[in-house]
Amino acid sequence: MPLLIDRPVFIMAAPRSCSTLLFETMSRSAHLWSIGDESHQLIEQFPPLNPLAEADSNRVTAEPLQGAIGEELGRSLRRAFALNLRDREGARPPPEGSVRLLEKTPKNALRIPFLAALYPDALFIHLVRDPKENIASIIDAWRSRRFVTYPTIATANGPWSLLLPPGWRDRLEAPLEEVAAFQWQAANQHILDDLAAIPRERRCTLNASELLADPRAVAERLCRFIDIPMDEEFASGLMQPLPLSMYTLHAPRPDKWRRHGGALQRVWPRIAPLIDRLNASLDAGTPALDAAGPPPDAVVASPDEAERHHDPHSEMGDVGRNSPCPCGSGRRFKACHGRLT
């Protein structure tokens, strides 16, 4: 009998929702397997799932799995996941038996009907983050040029970054804060709508603030939900502070969003109704999101001030000075965004 992926676990979240931190934390369990990173290429190698081929966006329903061609697509994708599985030590699974897959890719927020058809026993974790922090982080991600997903899609804000929701063509010339709010809103709206069709026992919600405040308690809760034991090595590792995730742009700071205060104020009326709906969907005991918009006295830096105080090293991460600049200019980092001043 070939290797079976039993009750895979999908983390569903808008981009920049601390989903990588949650994925890296739970990947330390001896009872979970993953492909080690996000599954962009693994999924989008199939034309019906690729916006640059046959798909129009990252939104995918169960339709591509229908018919004989769809059945073959499903088998091929399940095989691709199985062939790329690794445990926390990087070891391959045995050729037979069953394993539990942990998967996290923000684009999957738009693919729940597809994933539920691909794996009818799948479990889903909906991770939410404070909207001010989340949308501000999406803005930072676009500006960093480290999260470009579709380089051939040109926008007023540079090549398209992060997930590609339906309606993206209408935002090609939009201000960056509108694009960021659009991505946050589309991801969470589709998650809420699609998870409503999933049995209650196969889904749960989590606020990123819980993970940051008490990772041990969150891990214990998720192990119960996933139905796996917490092994001793996993538990002992959670006694230490969580490290920064691999995709962290800036060191965490509670008021970091304030530098985008003016931008957030402009988009807040549009997203406020969804915040109320998200709060209504949270599991009992899950902290609610702050529905209050940025206060009038939020620190708002003008573009010139932001540029003067901009630290390229914090945006670009750990880049060698002789490496190509991540901004895509073609120049070395030391001669571009890494220039010493």
What is each model feature region?
Residues 1-86, 155, 241-242, 247, ...:
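PAPS-dependent sulfotransferase catalytic core
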Residues 297-341:
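Acidic/negatively charged segments and metal-coordination signatures
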Residues 13, 104, 329:
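The Walker A (P-loop) glycine that initiates the GxxxxGKT/S ATP-binding motif of P-loop NTPases
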Residues 77-111:
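Glycine-rich phosphate-binding loop used to anchor ATP phosphates in small-molecule kinases
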Residues 5-8, 98, 323:
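Pre-Walker A (Motif I) flank of P-loop NTPase domains
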